[in-house]
Amino acid sequence: MRRVTVGVIGSGGIFQGAHLPGYSDVQEAKLVALCDVSEEVLKNAEKRTKKLYLERVENAKEDGKPELAEQLKGDAADIRTYKSAEEMLSKEDIDLADICTPTKFHNPLAVMALKSGSNVMVEKPMARTYLECLDVIEAVKDTGKLYQHNENWLYDPIWYNAKKFIESGIIGELQLVFVATAHGGPEWASWFWDPEIAGGGALLDNGVHAITASWYLNGFEKSPVAVKAAEPYGICIRMKTRLLQGMFKPFIVEDDAHVLIRYEGESGGWSTAHVEGSWSHRDSMETRMIGTNGEIQPHEDEKGVVLKIVDSFGSIREISLGKRTWTMSFGGEIRNMCNCVISGARPVCDENIGAETTAVVQAAYLSQKRGKRAVTLDEFKEYASTLREKEGKDAPKVLLKEMLGAIKVYA
């Protein structure tokens, strides 16, 4: 079996907590190098990686898989570390670069890795701004390499199985999707609250999951055509201060966002999604997919995940999907990209999906800026293009400032 050599750029939280468990379970991937600018983070990542791989060695032995045990043992011994992406990309024969840095560095590192001859996958969001996404799209075209926008929800049993039932026609034609992704906030990492680094708040962090998932459910053959910051909250700041770096501080990125998206297909069909991206817990409708003949409602408890399908007469069918773990979907995206590299197939969730998702986010900011008026994607892109012509290389920074300027404390 051919194995894909992988170098990780950014070895901190999302790599150690989510990607790393996936790598140890994906035989198609051979993790050869870790890179991080922080020596402390890098040492910890190396230690955790080798520890986990050696634990998997023992598991493989117990399962009667000596060849797998030897492979994992060799992988653990071979991992090398670097403090700069440039050095790693120049010294290693990397098939695939996995970029797990804060958002500000996504697009320059992706472009660098593509130009070095590596295929690339990048943790969501693709970049801080739509204009930065365009730089990556250009690099993909110039190099002919593959790019995967890492939206792990596509590999989660809830969304994957809901998509199956929607395509089967069991609820008729999909009309409306509610997708909420919310938690209490990432106070543990100061960079999330810095727009210069993060590019936005809860909408760009959590909300992109909901946006791409709602698009996936509707079908990537459709396109997002219009966006509206939804009443009453729109995109706003719900808490005036947060405990950041050990003390109460004000902040300027949104901690709550409610957005309406219209999707249209070439045949004239259309549907709507309401998405919430929040760091102040959910206050929108629970996730559900509503069709002309019924709806799908996902639920999860200690027994596992259940999809409840309710038809137009109120009859209920429950589909048990078993238990899931938080990290299993990350293994799915890693395996998918490795097999794309091996086969040469384009990832389903590619650079265009990533860029359009970012465009939806920024069109929502523009809608908020314009009093929550609906904004078409074409309208937003013309706005961004005009800024690019006027501001040149400073355009992404100006666009970022203008889009976030309308976010205020909700009162």
Language-model features and meaning:
Residues 1-116, 134, 138, 142-143, ...:
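N-terminal glycine-/serine-/threonine-rich beta1-alpha1-beta2 phosphate-ribose binding loop
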Residues 2, 40, 96-98, 339-411:
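C-terminal helix-rich "cap/oligomerization" subdomain common to oxidoreductases
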Residues 14, 40, 323-334, 358:
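Active-site loop of classical SDR/Rossmann-like NAD(P)-dependent oxidoreductases
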Residues 29, 79, 118, 145-146, ...:
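Short, well-ordered coil/turn segments that N-cap beta-strands
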Residues 112-115, 161, 333-343, 360-364:
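Solvent-exposed, amphipathic alpha-helical segments
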Residues 121, 127-189, 211:
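A contiguous active-site-proximal alpha/beta segment in oxidoreductase catalytic domains
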Residues 190-272, 276-283, 352-355:
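Rossmann-like dinucleotide-binding domain that binds NAD(P)(H)
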Residues 247-257, 262-333, 379, 384, ...:
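NAD(P)-dinucleotide binding in Rossmann-like oxidoreductases
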